[in-house]
Amino acid sequence: PYGTKSPASIARYACQAAALLQRRDIKLLVVACNTASAVALDALREQMRPLPVIGVVEPGAAAAVDARPAGRHLVLATEATVRLGAYREAILGLDAGATVDELACEMLVALAEVEQRRGSVAETFAGVIGGDGAVAVSASILID
């Protein structure tokens, strides 16, 4: 788990993993980790050039805005993702009328990592926080 690591460590780990994949002659890299996308996407794009590198923050933010235009969104994510404000920036970049709150929630990350991020986990967090709808995005849940 990257969430409590320093940005330098996260970028180093992500770039090392990408280098291993690059040796396998991949055609595209999807960075399917919110924290790695928030911290290391630019470094990965530079390292993997000319291959396309796609992160999950921008598509996740777009899904949240599509689900709740001008809505209030709560981002539950790793400490690093929250500290960087990646979702806040991406959501507000798409919808200046949105409200974005962020909360570091390492327990949710642990649940997601054991593939319990659907159904009851998302519903439990929505109920605890008082949300009436949730869009699950990797290890983050955006709730309005």
Regions found by a protein language model. Give the residues of each.
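Non-catalytic structural scaffold of enzyme domains
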Residues: 1-144
